[in-house]
Amino acid sequence: MAVGKEIRIKIASVRNTQKITRAMEMVAASKMRRTQDRLQATRPYARKIARIIKHLAQANPEYKNPFMVERPVKRVGVVLVSSDRGLCGGLNSNLFRLLLRRMRAWGEAGVEVRLGVIGQKGASFFGGVGADVAAQVVRLGDTPHLEGIIGVLKVMLDAYGEGEIDELYVAHNEFVNTMTQKPKLECLAPIKAEELSDELKGHWDYLYEPDAKTVLDALITRYIESLVFQGLVENNACEQAARMVAMKSASDNAGKLIKELQLIYNKARQAAITQEIAEIVGGAAAV
């Protein structure tokens, strides 16, 4: 029963792997729920800032913050949000394909692209293809904080403020539901006040201290930071959801493989028993 022994070893190995994938599925489900709660908490902050920015921009039309002025596009900056780890299906590869398509389109139009990368997978991939990576940060963990990405954001915001790039985008995965995550490329700058929150019907006039210009300058930076952080938290939720689905699929496939191996083992065992009976009967007949 040498063949039977090999099959039993394979079955035991697959069962051990199945235990690991089931545990990873449960961990990912728990992390996804926590990340969804964080995502819901970040959205009102960005919406409130957008509302104030629109109010300030409409109340002071003569002042144009550099982040609200459109200019000819010769250079583009993209903040890419990816995961640090794999085992999450095609989450990262789908996002990378979207960004590569846009980078090719920009390249054909003579537009240069500069990247600020968040996440190990994005840093490894775009570093490997020779992209212009101006800044990167990796290993932020499962509960990232804004302080962890400030360095990358400052590099990209300074580049925009100094005219080194003419448009700024953020690329991340959008959380639709547990089964669906969509790659998304969102424009951060220039900000178009008319496209911000439309909750200004019947609003009050406010007095700002120290003055409206200073408040607007500070809020625009905070607004862009909040959008990127929201994208980071959303991408984190997508990662955990994709990992949960991938590990469930792996566990299901392991179960199917165990059944197939068990069937092969039973057939091999049955054939061995039949062979032994035939040999015994043959020996008795010879006597």
Swiss-Prot record:
Family annotation (InterPro entries): ATP_synth_F1_ATPase_gsu, ATP_synth_F1_gsu, ATP_synth_F1_gsu_CS
GO-annotated cellular components: plasma membrane; proton-transporting ATP synthase complex
PROSITE patterns: ATPASE_GAMMA
Keywords: ATP synthesis, Cell inner membrane, Cell membrane, CF(1), Hydrogen ion transport, Ion transport, Membrane, Transport
Record membrane topology: Peripheral membrane protein
Gene Ontology biological process terms from the UniProt entry: proton motive force-driven plasma membrane ATP synthesis
Recorded GO MF terms: ATP binding; proton-transporting ATP synthase activity, rotational mechanism
Presence of the UniProt keyword Transcription regulation in the record: no
Localization per Swiss-Prot or TrEMBL: Cell inner membrane
Top-rank taxon, per record: Bacteria
Entry function: Produces ATP from ADP in the presence of a proton gradient across the membrane. The gamma chain is believed to be important in regulating ATPase activity and the flow of protons through the CF(0) complex.
Subunit organization: F-type ATPases have 2 components, CF(1) - the catalytic core - and CF(0) - the membrane proton channel. CF(1) has five subunits: alpha(3), beta(3), gamma(1), delta(1), epsilon(1). CF(0) has three main subunits: a, b and c.
Name of the protein described by the UniProt record: ATP synthase gamma chain
Lineage: Bacteria, Pseudomonadati, Pseudomonadota, Gammaproteobacteria, Methylococcales
Gene assigned in the entry: atpG
